[in-house]
Amino acid sequence: MNTVRVTFLLVFVLAVSLGQADKDENRMEMQEKTEQGKSYLDFAENLLLQKLEELEAKLLEEDSEESRNSRQKRCIGEGVPCDENDPRCCSGLICLKPTLHGIWYKSYYCYKK
């Protein structure tokens, strides 16, 4: 019976010591995996940040082009002479020949539509 106890004790000690070694190895593996995961997440985060910055630059560029092109160029106000062939009247105005007053000037003027 003594040999059974000694054998059992020996097996128990071996199991505990090997189990702790596995536990330490598992802990080390988990730390390595989390470090790799962090580096992967950092890489993915940087890649996403670059894509967002590129997209933002494109959007800002389009906005500046749009505002530059949509801005109304210098225009002629109401009651100001204009050229019949090249009217530059402001929006909401049209280049017409004057009625009654101003007919002696023989010129076109910008009037409201």
From Swiss-Prot:
The presence of a 'disulfide through disulfide knot' structurally defines this protein as a knottin. GO terms for molecular function: sodium channel inhibitor activity; toxin activity. InterPro entries: Toxin_22. This is U11-theraphotoxin-Hhn1g. Probable ion channel inhibitor. It is found in: Secreted. The keyword Signal applies. It comes from the Eukaryota. Disulfide bonds join C75-C90, C82-C95, C89-C110. It comes from Cyriopagopus hainanus. Belongs to the neurotoxin 14 (magi-1) family. 01 (HNTX-16) subfamily. GO terms for cellular component: extracellular region. Residues 1-21 form the signal peptide. Expressed by the venom gland. Residues 22-74 form a propeptide. Pfam families: Toxin_22. Keywords: Disulfide bond, Ion channel impairing toxin, Knottin, Secreted, Signal, Toxin. Residues 61-83 are annotated as: Disordered. Its main location: secreted.
